[in-house]
Amino acid sequence: MEAQSHSSTTTEKKKVENSIVKCSNRTDVSEKAVASSTTSNEDESPGQTYHRERRNAITMQPQGGQGLSKISEEPSTSSEERASLIKKEIHGSISHLPEPSVPYRGTLVTMDPRNGYMDPHYHPPHLFQAFHPPVPIDARHHEGRYHYEPSPIPPLHVPSALSSSPTYSDLPFIRISPHRNPAAASESPFSTPHPYINPYMDYIRSLHSSPSLSMISAARGLSPTDAPHAGVSPAEYYHQMALLAGQRSPYADIIPSAATAGAGALHMEYLHAMDSTRFPSPRLSARPSRKRTLSISPLSDHSFDLQTMIRTSPNSLVTILNNSCSSWSASGSYGHLSASAISPALSFTYPPTPVSLQQMHQQIISRQQTLGSAFGHSPPLIHPAPTFPTQRPIPGIPSVLNPVQVSSGPSESTQHNKPTSESAVSSTGDPMHNKRSKIKPDEDLPSPGAGSVQEQPEGMTPVKEEGDKDESKQEPEVVYETNCHWEGCSREFDTQEQLVHHINNDHIHGEKKEFVCRWLDCSREQKPFKAQYMLVVHMRRHTGEKPHKCTFEGCTKAYSRLENLKTHLRSHTGEKPYVCEHEGCNKAFSNASDRAKHQNRTHSNEKPYVCKIPGCTKRYTDPSSLRKHVKTVHGPEAHVTKKQRGDIHPRPPPPRDPGSHSQTRSPGQQTQGATGEQKDLNSTTSRREECLQVKAVKSEKPMTSQPSPGGQSTCSSEQSPISNYSNNGIELTLTGGGSVGDLSVIDETPIMDSTISTATTALGLQARRNMTGTKWMEQVKLERLKQVNGMLPRLNPVPPSKAPTLPPLIGNGTQSNSSCSVGGSMTILPNRNELSSTDITVLNMLNRRDSNTSTISSAYLSSRRSSGISPCFSSRRSSDASQAEGRPQNVSVADSYDPISTDASRRSSEASQCDDLPSLLSLTPAQQYRLKAKYAAATGGPPPTPLPNMERMSLKTRMALLGDCRESGISPLPPVNAPRRCSDGGANGYSRRHLLSHDALGNGTRRASDPVRMVSNNLSVPRVQHFNSLNSFNSPALPPSMEKRNLVLQNCTHSEGGVFRGFSSPCPPSISENVTLEAVTMEAGGSLNDEDLLPDDVVQYLNSQNQGTCDHLLNNVLDSNKMHHSVVLGNNNPSSFDRAPPASSQPAGSEVSKSDLPIQWNEVSSGSSDLSPTKLKCSQRSAVQQARAFGLYNNMMVQQQNLQRGNVYQQNGYQNLMENNGSYSLQQNTVLGSGASSSFGMQPNKPYGESVSRQPMIFGAMDSSCGITVQGQKLRSSNMPVSGNQQNFGHPIASSDQATSMANGMQNRNVMEQEYLQNELVGDGIHYQGVNQSSPMTLGQVSPTSQSSLHQGPQSCPPVSHTIGNQSSGLSVAKSYQPCANYSGNRRQNVLRNNLAQQQGHVSDGNQTYRVNTIKLEMQGQSQQFCSNMQNYSGQLYDQTTGFSHQAMKIGSSFFVSEANCLLQETATANSSELLSPGANQVSSTVDSLDSNSLEGVQIDFDAIIDDGDHVSLISGALSPSIIQNLSRNSSRLTTPRASLTFP
């Protein structure tokens, strides 16, 4: 039979081979087939022939070589044909069973493709049996059990095998592939006979063995020409079309294959990757355009862990079970169904007979046309039908294809359009059709009049192009802009990267409060975004930047949005998490947009998306279709403008909902769709997909479409790339929309998410990019824009109330932020600016929860906007949650959504944000952050540094840390008064609010989360204080000046919301790396919280320790510090620091108090131990926080370590350490040694920490050596002295000395320097820093002048620190913090004094040390709290100003000033310290360590910070979130910096 088949098909095969091999010969074709089939980008000509031919090939098969050749030429959607061609190519030289030109397609079944013999028709029953097994197979596929080695077992395997093997389809396909010459051909191609062929064959095999394919083959062979085709086709097709043959084989082979399941399995094993490979194969082959289309690389398709992915994906599994019964449908892409026909059709192809299948196929096809959901639901047959039809008759393929395209195009295709998510399900057999249809809609869009069917043939090529278009989605690459066209800027760059960096750092970051695209001719018309990340993502439309690249081998797609990439990856993995919500409908989609489209078209006749162009009455079921329509008919600009302006009503009808409700297109539409309307609809499907995508991306129905970007995205994006659509039909559509949609990051994001189909997603993203890239589109847009200029207003007003918060958020320090921060659901906030700060604040307060509404990219928005609302609790909360969760959320807002699931991504973000508090809290932000840090440390990546997000998270995280706050019972919203830091709410938190009673306690306001929360005065101060300690203490001490200062700093730093905007280095990178940050934050969602800074246990510990523990710790800190020192020193890893400090902390804690374990973390900040656990917690947080915090922490740690080593009481030892290391060395070493820098996971911090340590040492290192040593001890007792540049502590001590009248030569000098630096730094450093807040003058005031001054001193103190230099400053701040934190160290100070005294002898600075101790003692009583506040504030401010002072201030002076301020603060806060004594100490400790770390971390970021002027924020970030929380508002600011620090 084989021989017969061989001879009979030899001619045909040769023809096919000629046509295919001619083109590319096996290798080339294989390659292309693999890539393009997976990608749906068929090779042109031959490639195209075979790849699109696959499906048609089967159909053409009966016609023999002619049909095949014809199909080869025609970009049919026949996967089988393609498969066959591919396989043929692959096996070109290998003489496989000649594909018998046996004139019986139906008879095809007769041939056992495996054996190549004309075996009985096993397919009908077996096929279905195989189909049935596929359901289990699906599960197996998910489980990865479908590694069938299509063993070349020849006959193998007839019906029984097929039936018996649930993997029948998979096996058959794979086997078929190999089976051709069962043993020889199969082995030859499958085995390593041809390296290229092997992979390719594997790929084909994967197609074949893919249950989908098998099903398709069966479905196609069976359905269209069921029995006949299966028999002959498998052998014939196998040779003729590797894939189709495989499919046929599966149909006929699979049956026999099942018999030799073992061998088949082995073969599969051989092609184990083929499991996945077959996945791609069938997809490529059977439904190359389907989801598989996107996966260009066979690897991604077949060898990709589709099974794993699908297995992992519950939805996907369900879908697979439902849709791809026989396939894990290609590697578990349930809907991959790739042999979707198989899966839905074969698997569920009820008719066991080929005829029935054929009939069913036809019926399904019509149904499909009618249904458009046929592929997804019970009509799995439909899919197979399309597949079969394609397989069946050559004309049938086009015919069926056309119908499929017509019906599938509008509905299925539309669904495919996306990333063929539905397509994956629906067009199981005919991804090409669907895809073609999908593409067609794009093409149709250009010519809405064209008929859907008419375009179908075109669609074939377009299908091929679709993959390209998918890639074209990356068209922004086409844009590849290197010149800046920002308003008032015309700089030219050599590379796109440089341009992006410039835009992110100079323009986006610069406009901290306003997220407005000022790109010339931007269709957004300067409509503000809700979050910076959105703007960053949006700018990719203009620059063409596509930072998100597909990691699949052979796949070159890149996306501007992470969501789109994630969606695209689903095309490789076959994951279809979006299941139709309608009862009885099992269709699943890779993106929400496709699902929405499907639902709207199939299950609803509603067409909620109405064209807003005057005189146009078109209505669509999904936003993408509307966008496409607008772009194609009215011009990209018109749509963009409309959508951008919120003109697009689609938003009102929830994009997703419509998707759910309307399948307007379904049957009727498909029919209608054939007409111009259908075309429109087809395009609409594309558009709709895009819109839906937008929706999906938005995850919130309207959000996606509607956000300021939405309009564009939805409408403009659709057809804007009309011309593009050819490249990437959908993509183009998206591109147009992309441009516009990109206008609204949200839309873009939605598109990403919505563009579930990898292609579509990519397309959506890239379409936007394309739009930019497509000058044509831009021009059209401009024209349209002009035409629709009147409509812009409409669009703009869409959700002004919500949106207002976003732009101001970054722009103005606190207040702006407030505005920005409004919008918990910033996702859809189009006119964030329109709301006033107050409104936003109020709204935020209402929404405030944690920007829970700002689900979308609320992370940024939320944190920013929340922060923007900063005055409100929301801001902080948002920031808090945002920071913790917001950060990832922020990161993933636009790009960092869960691209994979729009809702998931956005909702994830939302959940993240909303969940922030709970979820982050559940995992404690500290824990999350630590996890991130650990992960970063483990992976060698940068520590969790989404500073902006972190900052934003700061507020939100603060909220999440409200876990801390909440733990403490801090739930009150801060008044909506002055906005705190833009992002962090720090401005408000810091500057706007004074130290409230609870704040003063250091427990009061919980970090940014709870600015004014009056919880309990002790409110678990430790936690709040421990990072918020700076804030907490500062809050009381420097509410006025701090407020101002923080305001400025906040504005500058904008840690939460405008995280990026405030930092040049970390922030800009964040902005530039927004995608990365988004991804990182998305993946490490709530890792940047206060908890991030502090481990859970530390937080708990701090909470439990509170203030009382602080004092106790103070005593034990000395011993603890000793242990700490060693421990801390031992912990040199950034993440190690996180863990190690606690570990090291434990010894110290045991010394001091095991319950102070968290102090161990604080230990990291040497003062921590002495301080209260809270302090330690803060320190820990700080450590966890990152480099910036790390600097402060580091120093503290160093000191602590030194002290520990030298024994706090053994100043000599400590001195020796100091001497050995040099005050600097010690600190530096300690920081580094203790891993404060590295420990904190801020490698950049390390250098910074080192530098900082050295710098401070330089000007006051010797001094500080002693002082620091002493201080280290003191810090142990009072945290502050321990700070790395303990000069700062020493200086603060000196300051204290002045205040305390204990002026050692060094201390005096320090004090003097500090005073000088304070004045200078405050005036110069702080102002220089750009904080330009009262802090500079406050610092001057506070400097060594008085304790009351010190109260304000925190503000001034930080500047001093800053002035010290980035590092020095950080140290100063740390010191400042520590002295402030020392208030609880009365006895600690005494001990320190003793220690210092001891130390003095050993260190030249013994006096200073002593003085510091004395001062500390005095201060403890009076200014500890104040000092703590000051420290906290200083830390924040200091961190912020550090960058500036780093540049403009003398390190030594700064150091001393900081010290003086700290001491002053301490002294001034002596009373406060009493109030905050335990908690304050803890906070102090935290501050101390924070100071060290912060300084260090800040220093790390100082360069960037200096540029960004967000130093305070940075340091704030360095400071533990608790401190930030403590200071509530102040805390917010601190928090923001903390985030910054976290993301150097």
From Swiss-Prot:
Q: Does the keyword Ribonucleoprotein apply?
A: no
Residue ranges, compositional bias (Basic and acidic residues):
463-476, 634-650, 686-701
Matching Gene3D superfamilies: Classic Zinc Finger
| Cysteine disulfide partners in this protein | none
- PROSITE patterns linked: ZINC_FINGER_C2H2_1, ZINC_FINGER_C2H2_2
Q: Name one GO cellular component term.
A: nucleus
UniProt PTM: Phosphorylation is essential for its proteolytic processing. The repressor form (GLI3R), a C-terminally truncated form is generated from the full-length GLI3 protein (GLI3FL) through proteolytic processing.
Q: Which UniProt keywords apply?
A: Activator, Cytoplasm, DNA-binding, Metal-binding, Nucleus, Phosphoprotein, Repeat, Repressor, Transcription, Transcription regulation, Zinc, Zinc-finger
List the InterPro entries hit by this protein, alphabetically.
Answer: GLI-like, Znf-C2H2_ZIC1-5/GLI1-3-like, Znf_C2H2_sf, Znf_C2H2_type
Q: Name one GO biological process term.
A: negative regulation of DNA-templated transcription
The GO molecular function terms of this record are: DNA-binding transcription factor activity, RNA polymerase II-specific; RNA polymerase II cis-regulatory region sequence-specific DNA binding; zinc ion binding
* Record bears the keyword Transport: no
Q: Where is the composition biased (Polar residues)?
A: 1-10, 402-429, 660-685, 702-728, 1330-1355
Question: Where are zinc fingers of the kind C2H2-type found along the chain?
Answer: 482-509, 520-542, 548-572, 578-603, 609-634
> For bias kind Low complexity, which ranges apply?
865-882
- Region of interest called Disordered, as start-end residue ranges on this chain: 1-83, 373-477, 622-728, 865-919, 1126-1155, 1327-1368
The listed locations are:
Nucleus; Cytoplasm
PANTHER family linked: TRANSCRIPTIONAL ACTIVATOR CUBITUS INTERRUPTUS (PTHR45718), TRANSCRIPTIONAL ACTIVATOR GLI3 (PTHR45718:SF5)
Q: Which family does it belong to?
A: Belongs to the GLI C2H2-type zinc-finger protein family.
Question: What is the documented function of this protein?
Answer: Has a dual function as a transcriptional activator and a repressor of the sonic hedgehog (Shh) pathway, and plays a role in limb development. The full-length GLI3 form (GLI3FL) acts as an activator (GLI3A) while GLI3R, its C-terminally truncated form, acts as a repressor.
The name under which this protein is listed is Transcriptional activator GLI3
Source organism per entry reads: Gallus gallus (Chicken)
Its encoding gene is what? GLI3
